[in-house]
Amino acid sequence: QAEDGIRDVERSRGLGDVYKRQFHMLDKTKFYINGEWVNPSKKNDFDVINPSNEEVCAKITLGNLEDTDKAIQSAKKAFETWKETSKQERVALLEKLLKIYNERYDEMTDAITTELGCPRDWCSANQTSSGASHIEDFIKRLKEFNFEPGFDKGSKNQILYEPIGVCGLITPWNWPINQIALKVVPALATGCTMILKPSEIAPLSGMLFAEMIHEAGFPSGVFNLVNSDGAGVGTILSGHKDVDMVSFTGSTRAGRLITKNAADTIKRVCLELGGKGGNIVFADSYPDAVRDGIRNVMSNSGQSCDAPTRMLVERSIYERAVKELSLIHISEPTRPLYISYAVFCL
């Protein structure tokens, strides 16, 4: 009943008021560098739009070379001590981060619902939960991982796994905290330091995550966040001589540019690029194949790298497919059991 009451308040006030209530303490025009929120070197404001109502829900500043270099040098300095921390120390900090994440779970849901425009109930069950599950899973893997395994039985040779160094992490808007957790948490776990550039279209979840990292007590400079677009900070990160690795999730076009830009510094490049396949449904497929296919497309408004957005159905079941599709409704993201306009509708 309490949860229903909260949702009724949200519906009556509108998501904009929910956003203000949740984020009034966070200055969206600042960057997180060397353990503190700092002003940008130059003001270059950018409106963050709530796609469900096309209203400005926040303002951020797009960083430049000076901001990015400051973050990189902070990460480079922190790496000298962070790389020497024990596995037990890093596990303890990540467990604290997980605890804080779960305590502020609803705030993260509000952030993603606002920046992405997706239904709040679905966001909580899928988007927000992915962050928690990834943190939990990486903690488990870190506890199990042997950083100094033997080479061969009876051999005097030794394998030593060492952190790569300073990592530039560039994440997309469609699964914001999912991708942030998939990049940031393993980097923290292995002793790397980093600069995160979340999508400028959906930056709120990343900034909230930075708050959580700060609250967990990670050393200054280990994690840094600079907002910008891909052509700005993304280009700087991929080509900077003091960045040892860049990890990017996004379009194939941008992936090509990052690979070329990183070549001169011979840094490691990890790419997860776009790609979808057709969904073919025959008349003798299992009974719920059409329904499941449509739901897989409409989930997250089709904005997932694995969404089967092309459905080819056998002619004899075409009308059934159309009927299933007609059951999908578009409405406000605070209403349950609906899909809503995502960022791609802008």
Over which residues does each language-model region extend?
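Rossmann-like NAD(P) dinucleotide-binding subdomain of oxidoreductase/dehydrogenase enzymes
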Residues: 146-288
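Residue-level signal for inorganic ion chemistry
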Residues: 54, 90, 112, 135, ...
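Single conserved hydrophobic/aromatic residue that forms the stacking wall/gate
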Residues: 1-22, 328-346
